[in-house]
A protein has these predicted regions:
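A short SAM/SAH-binding and catalytic strip from SAM-dependent methyltransferases
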Residues: 262-278
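SAM-dependent methyltransferase
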Residues: 291, 295-359
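A short acidic, Gly/Pro-enriched loop at the edge of an enzyme's catalytic core
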Residues: 254-264
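Compositionally biased terminal segments of proteins
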Residues: 1-143
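C-terminal lobe and adjacent flexible extensions of AdoMet/dcAdoMet transferase-like proteins
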Residues: 356, 360-395
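A short glycine-rich, Lys/Arg-flanked "PGG" loop and its adjoining helix->strand segment in the class I
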Residues: 278-293
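Class I SAM-dependent methyltransferase SAM/SAH-binding core
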Residues: 196-252
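Conserved class I S-adenosyl-L-methionine
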Residues: 137-193, 206
């Protein structure tokens, strides 16, 4: 039955492509196209562009489609294609080609259009399959995390030394002005002394050491052994103590979800390593005590997804809404000798929109208190957001 379902999916896609009728598979059919296991292969659902709906009806005349049923919002007809019940629908006054969650997937030798898994954030039809979607993304995440972990454990210590110098010397600089290392989000952290703080994906430990100098009890979670080595040497040089847990954040054991943390911090270039935000924010909520605060300082998607800048010139080169998963150079490669850059493994990233972020946090039950968008400090970038700080609390 699965083979027949696959054949019918590609058959109908090919017919519509040949007729230049925009379409996308929806619901359970969209899950199938994207590789998610589904529990039945008896029904297919798809949308076509509303102003060519009648052309689609004529196109499938050999399958004896039913008379269309119409409402003010939609129209649809049913037909039987090789023993599979197919629903073809249109949504009036919408444009399929500009749907931000319309996704092209390779199936054999052809491209097939479907509704992205991530549309579950906003659409009830896809939200019905949330359990299947999260299970699929979790399995995919494990593979991507393994790739990213390998990339971040290849000579990163050398890159950190090239960037910052000797850890002991850097520790001395941090001690001179630890608050500066926490700019611009320090103002949202309140009194630091005596607080229990976890820095997720805490990298090289610079922020953790600054927090420890200010009197916090600091825990760092990161999957890079080389980051841990640098961070522990940095803490020793600053004569402070930090707990560095070498672990993937999503694999962090339940003992660290005891609800006793005053603050959880994440910052700069971290969310794009996750292809599903729900498990992260659920974990953060479990870590925080009631009234505890989550502070996120991240690169703004306008600068990472949409615009390419070169001096005074700014050009739109990306698609802000694209839910694509990318393969990029590991961030520390710019601090490595040229002769070593070519041998470095690459990382897998998924860049999130502000809307996806806010919605995911809201659905986790954390309460958003602040979203501050911050400009670049470069004079040529006046008017463009570079980073943002988000503050959410567990109530």
């Amino acid at each position: 039955m699965k083979a027949s379902y696959y054949h019918t999916i590609t058959l109908m896609a090919n017919i519509l492509d040949q007729a230049n009728i925009p379409y996308q598979y929806t619901g359970r059919s969209a899950l199938f196209v994207q590789g998610v296991d589904i529990d039945e292969y008896k029904k297919i659902s798809m949308d076509v562009q509303w102003d060519v709906f009648n052309e689609a009806l004529d196109l499938f005349s050999e399958y004896a489609p039913t008379k269309p049923e119409r409402s003010p919002e939609t129209a649809f007809f049913l037909m039987d294609v090789e023993g599979i019940s197919v629903t073809v629908r249109c949504r009036f006054n919408t444009t399929i080609k500009t749907d931000p969650y319309r996704l092209s997937i390779k199936m054999g030798d052809m491209e097939v259009w479907c509704r992205s898994l991530y549309s579950y954030l906003y659409e009830e039809e896809m939200r019905k399959f949330s359990a299947e979607i999260h299970a699929y993304l979790s399995a995919e995440q494990k593979g991507f995390t393994a790739e990213n972990e390998q990339a971040w454990n290849q000579n990163n210590y050398l890159a950190l030394v090239n960037r910052y110098g000797n850890p002991v010397e850097l520790a001395s600089k941090i001690k001179q002005n630890p608050k500066w290392r926490l700019h611009p989000f320090y103002k949202y952290m309140g009194e630091i002394s005596g607080k229990k703080i976890t820095h997720l994906m805490g990298s090289n430990g610079v922020k953790a050491v600054a927090l420890a100098i200010l009197g916090a009890e600091v825990k760092v979670v990161d999957f890079s052994q080389e980051n841990a080595m640098f961070a522990n040497e940095l803490a020793s040089g600053a004569s402070v103590s930090i707990e560095y847990i070498v672990s993937d954040v999503l694999s962090l054991s339940s003992e660290h979800e005891s609800g006793n943390q005053d603050l959880v911090l994440m910052e700069l270039g971290v969310l794009h390593y996750l292809i599903d935000l729900q498990p992260l924010f659920e974990k953060i909520k479990k870590m925080l005590k009631p009234g505890g605060r989550f502070v996120l300082h991240e690169f703004h998607p306008i600068s990472t997804k949409l615009i390419t800048s070169n001096g005074k010139k700014h050009k739109i080169t990306g698609n802000y809404f694209a839910p694509a998963i990318e393969n990029n150079e590991v961030a520390f490669s710019k601090h490595m000798p040229d002769e070593e850059k070519g041998s470095l493994s690459r990382v897998v990233q998924r860049k999130w929109t502000i809307g996806e972020l806010i919605t995911s946090i809201g659905q986790s039950g954390l309460v958003i208190k602040v979203l501050e968008e911050e400009p670049n400090h470069k004079i040529h970038d006046i008017g463009l957001p570079k980073t943002y700080t988000l503050v959410a609390e567990r109530v």
